[in-house]
Each structure stands twice: as structure tokens, then as C-alpha cells.
Amino acid sequence: MSTELTVQSERAFQKQPHIFNNPKVKTSKRTKRWYKNAGLGFKTPKTAIEGSYIDKKCPFTGLVSIRGKILTGTVVSTKMHRTIVIRRAYLHYIPKYNRYEKRHKNVPVHVSPAFRVQVGDIVTVGQCRPISKTVRFNVVKVSAAAGKANKQFAKF
């Protein structure tokens, strides 16, 4: 019952489309759940298959497909609801001085409840349709933080 309350935290009743949850039929303990393979060699997490969350923007249980660019970055902020900010560092060449300078871009990314993401984790994201005004990417894989070497410049 407690998991049901956490799933139903919005005003509207949250359910997966085309899945009919008939309360009168008692066939099995397992609830019906729709999930898919995101493709491109990314595995569907167990929490997406066995979980009870409802997220229409999830690449595994929602109506969003991954296509286009695949990027990697480090998580710098998890303050938004189901959205994180990743930092992508790169080197820019300055011809006058024949040297490189460090630059970075912050990219807002939608994160499914199937993943537990913390600041410092390295995530792989895939491009999808525009989810909001700024969000165009979705987390497809999470790697643990590299360790205490986060002050060093890492090229992805």
C-alpha cells in the first residue's frame, strides 16, 4: 500500500496507457506492467521491469524513443524533479597560442525513477524528442562515481 501511495503522488490517477488494472479480477500477485527495450545496446534495468513507478517520459516504460546522439557526462545537480544537470567538459584549441583551453557545457537530462543518481556519477544519455523547454536527453545508463579524482580534467 505504501508503494501505491508513492506512485499516486500527482492529482490525476497515474497509470500506464493501454494497461487495464481490473480490481475485481484476482489472477496473480504480479501487476501488469508494460516495458520495452530502449535499443542501441542498452539493457532495461530490473527496477523498470519489476518497479511500480509511472513515468511517461521514461525510455523503458514510457512513450519516448532514444535516437540521435549518445553523450556521456558527470552529474552536477539533482535538485529538479526527475531532471538532472550533467556537465560535459571538452578542450577548445586556440590557434594563436597553439594551446588548448578547458570549456564545459551543462546539459539538462530527464532521469527515470528506475535509476538512483547522485552528484558525481557518470551517466550515459541518449537524445530523444523535446521533453520540455530545455530537456532533450534521457538517462539510459548510470556508472558509479570514479572516486576522489574528480578535480582532474576528464575527457569523455
Curated annotation (Swiss-Prot):
Crosslink site: Glycyl lysine isopeptide (Lys-Gly) (interchain with G-Cter in ubiquitin): 15, 46, 56-57, 79, 96, 105, 133, 141, 148
One annotated GO molecular function: structural constituent of ribosome
Superkingdom classification of source: Eukaryota
Statement: the UniProt record of this protein carries the keyword tRNA processing: no
Subcellular localization(s) per the UniProt record: Cytoplasm
Post-translational modification: N-terminally acetylated by acetyltransferase NatA.
InterPro entries (alphabetical): NA-bd_OB-fold, Ribosomal_uS17, Ribosomal_uS17_arc/euk, Ribosomal_uS17_CS, Ribosomal_uS17_N
Keywords, ordered alphabetically: Acetylation, Cytoplasm, Isopeptide bond, Ribonucleoprotein, Ribosomal protein, RNA-binding, rRNA-binding, Ubl conjugation
UniProt entry tagged with the keyword Disulfide bond: no
Main location: cytoplasm
Subunit (UniProt): Component of the small ribosomal subunit (SSU). Mature yeast ribosomes consist of a small (40S) and a large (60S) subunit. The 40S small subunit contains 1 molecule of ribosomal RNA (18S rRNA) and 33 different proteins (encoded by 57 genes). The large 60S subunit contains 3 rRNA molecules (25S, 5.8S and 5S rRNA) and 46 different proteins (encoded by 81 genes).
General remark: There are 2 genes for uS17 in yeast.
Record function comment: Component of the ribosome, a large ribonucleoprotein complex responsible for the synthesis of proteins in the cell. The small ribosomal subunit (SSU) binds messenger RNAs (mRNAs) and translates the encoded message by selecting cognate aminoacyl-transfer RNA (tRNA) molecules. The large subunit (LSU) contains the ribosomal catalytic site termed the peptidyl transferase center (PTC), which catalyzes the formation of peptide bonds, thereby polymerizing the amino acids delivered by tRNAs into a polypeptide chain.
Family: Belongs to the universal ribosomal protein uS17 family.
The protein's name in its UniProt record: Small ribosomal subunit protein uS17A
Lineage of producing organism: Eukaryota, Fungi, Dikarya, Ascomycota, Saccharomycotina
